[in-house]
Amino acid sequence: MSQVTTSYSYDAPTDFINFSSLTDEEDMQHIDSWFDEKANLENKFTGKDGTGGLYQGKTPLRKANLHRDVTPLRPVDNTYNKQAEKENLVEESIPSNECPSMKVKETTSRNNPVQPQRRSLRLSAKKNLEQKEKQHVKMKAKRCGTPVIINEFPPSKKMKVQKILKSTEEQELEKRMKMQQEVVEMRKRNEEFKKFALAGAGQPVKKSVSQVTKAVDFHFRTDERVKQHPKNQEEYKEVNFTSELRKHPPSPARVTKGCTIVMPFNLSQGKKRTFDETASTYVPLAQQVEAFHKRTPTRYHLRNRKDDIMPLPSKSVVRICRDPQTPVLQTKHRTRPVTCKSAADLEAEELEKQQQYKFKAQELDPRILEGGPILPKKPPVKPPTQPVGFDLEIEKRIQERESKKKLEEEHYEFHSRPCPTKILEDVVGVPEKKELPITVPKSPAFALKNRIRMPTKEDKEEEEPVMIRAQPVPYFGMPFKPQIPVGRTVEVCPFSFDSRDKERQLQKEKKIKELQKGEVPKFKAHPLPHFDTINLPEKKVKNTTQVEPFCLETDRRGALKAQTWKHQLDEELKQQKEAACFKARPNTVISQEPFVPKREKKSVIEGLSGSLVQEPFQLATEKRAKERQELEKRMAEVEALKAQQLEEARQQEEEQQKEELARLRKELVHKANPIRRYQGVEVKSSDQPLTVPVSPKFSTRFHC
């Protein structure tokens, strides 16, 4: 697969230089002549006199003596050819314990030379490219060869983990190194198994000595940061502020990394007391103070000035015997006030309450001294219950009906009255017939608008004059006396229940006295107590407080948070493992059409190297002006459309008014109807016979 055959053919121009045919000694100096000629042709332009001359303001693109300063262009090669070249360059980086299959692949790639690509490069650029790639591959092989130290503890959440993404080449090299190491380990295991199988069960087998664990130094991420210790910093110097405004501080020097000193982890511990500490043995305060002073270093203790002043050797210090005195302890002032009352205080309070209580004796009932059986008072005999009938409404209605019937049953006698004479003289009870006025014929009012004739004075009925009646003359025999309203003044009384409360209290006292007189208490003597045995109530001993551990909410939240944090770390590690796993994508480069450069069509002025061609531009004002014109045009069209619609509506309304006026005029013209002709009325005699009168047949059997 090192050599790829393509089915594409190109019709490219043949005016190019074949760099493979050139010799290194002859044409090394003139190797870039073709590029200089092209640059000189581009830099020529026609002057004022018509002659062509070099462009004075610009330097030529390339010079013959500047080969190494030009950055080499990378060829567009196939991935397989590129991989073959890199495998040739990695010879030195591959260790000697690689598998033979890898060597076979390398020999096949060496035997098949890479075909020269279509695009050409200068030899100087090609050499520089090869040297740089060799150095790059060596550095990568060294990095991959060094053992990778994986931190056992994942980084904390607050630390920012800088992920350095590796290229596909580095990932491939790492994968290859891992595979080589696995093959070497498998080979060693196979050899050991082979020796064990050949030796058999009877022969002693030499145990393979396991390699000693090599100590690996700790590699802290913080060592990569450049830090300056505060002790090593220079002393503060007074500097002029204005002169140092534009000066930037010098970059810190790269500190050489030394060996990391292995130190034990100093993990933070909470200062909260646990249950075991609180339940420890009791330690007196004096011992605690003494232990605290012993723990404190001597350099933190305050020294007494008297100790510094040494006594003179001439004077002898006389020791005086001192009497022991009790120390003035301050602990009694630190006692808390006792809120619970003692038993003596409680007994004193009960005694005071007993002394304050006054016994009120009741009056002596004289019947107790008189003697005889004391019987309870006989209750008063209540009168028998008198039955009271119900006063129902239905009974009232029945009584009213009976009374009405009695009134109706009264005997009625008929007394005739004289007949009025008016009945004989004239018609009585029939109203007089009103005489209607004779109808006066009048011509119809067709010419008027509403066809209604205005009423004339003759048509108006004569209104009857209103009769004015005089008021009766008042009687002046008695003088007029106006009625004076009686003054009713409401007296305001205070709202109080004093009188009613006093009456109730008197009634209550009276009732209590009656009850006391009625119920005489019976004397019952208590037996004499036995003083031999004293029965006291059992003393209630309270149970001691049971010590229980605190169930704090913070502990529960801490456990929950630790669980979630662990779950997040597991998820992050899983994602990192998935990201580190390499998955190759399918090779689509083989089936794709290769890149074909297209020649750009440029003018002579644009073809000049380094020339600045003014690109077309559009001002924002012009754009806004065009938009404004379009907006005004649209607004004018809308206004014209509105005016046209209004004009059409006005014309339509005028036509409707004209049609309505013509219709009204046509309706107002009178057209006389012809006289109607009716059929004559023929009087015919009736065919029915005359009514024969028949006397009624009255029956008297239903009469009472």
Swiss-Prot record:
As stated in the Swiss-Prot or TrEMBL entry, residues carrying the post-translational modification N6-acetyllysine are: 127, 332
* MF (Gene Ontology): importin-alpha family protein binding
Is Ubl conjugation there in the keyword field?
yes
Checking Pfam families in the record gives: Aurora-A_bind, TPX2, TPX2_importin
Q: Where on the chain is Phosphoserine found, per UniProt?
A: 120, 124, 251, 268, 316, 443, 695
Question: Example GO biological process term?
Answer: apoptotic process
- Chain residue ranges for the region called Disordered: 92-119
Query: InterPro entries from the entry?
Result: Aurora-A-bd, TPX2_C, TPX2_central_dom, TPX2_fam
Where does the UniProt annotation locate this protein?
A: Nucleus; Cytoplasm, Cytoskeleton, Spindle; Cytoplasm, Cytoskeleton, Spindle pole
Record's compositionally biased regions (Polar residues): 109-118
Q: Where is this cross-link: Glycyl lysine isopeptide (Lys-Gly) (interchain with G-Cter in SUMO2)?
A: 434, 457, 598, 697
The primary site where this protein sits is: nucleus
Tell me the keywords, alphabetical order: Acetylation, Apoptosis, Cell cycle, Cell division, Cytoplasm, Cytoskeleton, Isopeptide bond, Microtubule, Mitosis, Nucleus, Phosphoprotein, Ubl conjugation
Q: Which GO terms describe its cellular component?
A: cytoplasm; microtubule; nucleus; spindle; spindle pole
Which residues are recorded as modified (Phosphothreonine)? 59, 71, 146, 296, 326, 456
Subunit info here reads: Interacts with AURKA. Interacts with importin-alpha; leading to inactivate TPX2. Interacts with HNRNPU; this interaction recruits HNRNPU to spindle microtubules (MTs). Interacts with BCL2L10. Interacts with KIF11.
The entry sums up its family as follows:
Belongs to the TPX2 family.
Q: What is this protein called?
A: Targeting protein for Xklp2
State the organism of origin.
Bos taurus (Bovine)
Designated gene of the protein: TPX2
